[in-house]
Amino acid sequence: MTDNIAGKAYTIIFEEYPTYLYALVHSDKYGYDILAQFLREIADECKKRSFKQVLIEENISAVTSMTDVFRTASELPQLGFSKIRMAYVDRFADQKEMNEFGQMVAVNRGVNVKIFGSQEEADKWLSEKA
C-alpha cells in the first residue's frame, strides 16, 4: 500500500512480513511535524493490521535538528509506540549519530527501539524474538 494523500510531505509504502510490518518512508523534507505525522500513521497502521513489531526504513535526505529528534523520541509512547517493538533503518549513514541519540531518548521513555545499518540486520532482530 502506498500512501499518496495530497499535501503530505512524505509517502509511506507498507509491506507485511510474517512477524512485522515494514514501512518505507520517502521524503525530501524533515522536521518535528513530518516526523510526528508519519510515525503516528505507522503506529496506527500497526494497530489496524494487528502488528506488535515494525521495521521503519527512512529514505529522507534532509536533516532535522537535535531538538526535533529529542521531542519526537520523547513522544513516541503518545504517538502509539508504547507496545510496538521498533527496528529503525536510515538509508543515510551520515544521520547515524542523530538516530542513536533518538534511540537513547526513546529507550529512556520505555520504547523498545533499536537502530540498524541494514534491513537484513533489523529483520534478524525482529524475527528472533517473534
Place the predicted regions along the sequence by residue.
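Amphipathic, Lys/Arg-enriched alpha-helical "gate/interface" segment within cytosolic domains
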Residues: 2-130
